[in-house]
């Protein structure tokens, strides 16, 4: 499983659809393979929510099972202030040059993740013929007409995979803070070498469980980008990955 291919959903109230319902184009859940969404900021804003074309025989639904998985985001911030002597400080001790630097260092690392004991991945590999039929559906066609850009370009995203958390999961938030004063004084002694004593650093970590969900739900989706520029005669399809 490649985490970069999966986009976590912020909500936990999306019950998973069954495989037969997805194959027939009438999924029993609000988020399904075959759904079309407008952009990466609105992962649950389904355009063709009333249904879609049934999957052809050559578009089977593949499954994979994983244990002990987690998805989440990390937000790092770092603040450093440093001062350094502009030139070696001479003549404090005859024959010894002294250099120095000192500063403040503060870091804050926040982790917001979901942990799952068991997840099941459902995925399809859509054909161009099938996507052509999806794009001709009433809701998708109307959206494309309204959202066309300069020279007639447009873009939508198709859900090609869903990840289902079996038995729910835990939302864990942890924060690590570090702060300290650092500094060193360097001594250059002819014939002996250099010495540079330094001071230390302190970190604190705090972890808490924000929520514990106990029923199956769709926790992430996999997407392909379907786009057409005004200079091309046909649309293109590209797998989408998250940026970390």
Curated annotation (Swiss-Prot):
Keyword Transmembrane attached: yes
Location, primary (coarse class): cytoplasm
GO terms under cellular component: cytoplasm; plasma membrane
The keyword Transmembrane belongs to this UniProt entry's keyword annotation: yes
GO biological process: programmed cell death
Region Disordered: start-end pairs: 1-22
Record's keyword terms, sorted: Cell membrane, Cytoplasm, Membrane, Necrosis, Transmembrane, Transmembrane beta strand
Molecular-function GO terms, alphabetical: protein heterodimerization activity; wide pore channel activity
Membrane topology term: Multi-pass membrane protein
Compartment list: Cytoplasm; Cell membrane
Quaternary structure annotation from Swiss-Prot or TrEMBL: Heterooligomer; the heterooligomer with rcd-1-1 forms a ring-shaped pore complex when inserted in the membrane.
Function in brief: Gasdermin-like protein involved in heterokaryon incompatibility, a process that ensures that during spontaneous vegetative cell fusion, only compatible cells from the same colony survive (non-self-recognition). In N.crassa, the rcd-1 locus exists as 2 incompatible alleles, rcd-1-1 (AC Q7SBA0) and rcd-1-2 (this entry). During the allorecognition process, forms a heterooligomer with rcd-1-1, thereby forming a functional gasdermin-like complex that binds to membranes and forms pores, triggering cell death. Binds negatively charged phospholipids, such as cardiolipin and phosphatidylserine.
Family: Belongs to the gasdermin family.
UniProt protein name: Gasdermin-like protein rcd-1-2
Species annotation: Neurospora crassa
